[in-house]
Amino acid sequence: MPEGPQALQSPPATIFLLLISAAGLGPGCQALWVEWGPPSVTVSVGEEVRLQCTHNGSNTNVTWWHVLQSNSSWPPVMYRGDVGAGGELIIKPVNKTHRGMYRCQVSDGKKIQRSCGTYLRVRDPLPRPFLDMGEGTKNNIITAEGIILLICAVVPGTLLLFRKRWQNMKFGADIQDDYEDENLYEGLNLDDCSMYEDISRGLQGTYQDVGSLHIGDAQLEKP
């Protein structure tokens, strides 16, 4: 069995290949690249916008170029704005003159890469609503209004029904007794009555049953 130090020895060819690989992957041999970025960004007048310029360079110089909106065939103009860490372009506050295409250029020594560009759209601010409330608050208000309307419609009618019932229970018996004690013939002048409506006959029947009488004994009442 070989000793320990002899077993840990590596062939020179393997060490040479590892050195070549490390040299090939060093910072100087890496290709510089820049991300495309979003195709467009929309903001309102007066807001702040931040355009990213993501790249893999270590010692780079980032510049931004602005392509005017009126004519894209014109050469881009260097935009001298506020550039943050990592080449981020900061525009605040935004106005309509900032519209157009923005491209970042990354320089690392002799290597230069550019992004595809991001178009900045600037629109007028949305009108502020009279009642700036959320949807949940609006739904709660509508529910409360419905409950209030239901109460306003049901409660008065219910109170009127109970009031009418209470009046009938309190005064119904007295009114009924008054109608029973009232003399229906009070104030009636018997002389002015028709002879067919003579109420002074007492219990005498108005008509006679001629079917139950004999013909000889029939005595019809004369009018």
UniProtKB/Swiss-Prot annotation:
Q: What range does the record give for the signal peptide?
A: 1-31
Xref: Pfam families: Ig_3 (PF13927), ITAM (PF02189)
Cellular component per GO, a single term: external side of plasma membrane
Q: Does the keyword Lipoprotein apply?
A: no
The principal location of this protein is membrane
Q: Which cysteines are joined by disulfide bonds?
A: 53-104
Q: In which tissues is it expressed?
A: B-cells.
Q: Where is this site: Required for binding to BLNK?
A: 207
Topology feature Cytoplasmic, residues: 162-223
Name positions with the PTM Asymmetric dimethylarginine: 201
**What spans does the record annotate as topological domain Extracellular, numbered to this chain?**
32-140
Q: Where are the transmembrane segments?
A: 141-161
Question: Which superkingdom?
Answer: Eukaryota
Q: Which PROSITE patterns match?
A: IG_LIKE, ITAM_1
Ig-like C2-type domain sequence ranges: 32-120
What does the record say about domains? The transmembrane helices of CD79A and CD79B chains and two IgM heavy chains assembly in a four-helix bundle structure that appears to be conserved among different BCR isotypes.
Spell out the subunit comment. Heterodimer of alpha and beta chains; disulfide-linked. Part of the B-cell antigen receptor complex where the alpha/beta chain heterodimer is non-covalently associated with an antigen-specific membrane-bound surface immunoglobulin of two heavy chains and two light chains. Interacts through its phosphorylated ITAM domain with the SH2 domains of SYK which stimulates SYK autophosphorylation and activation.
Write down what this protein is called: B-cell antigen receptor complex-associated protein alpha chain
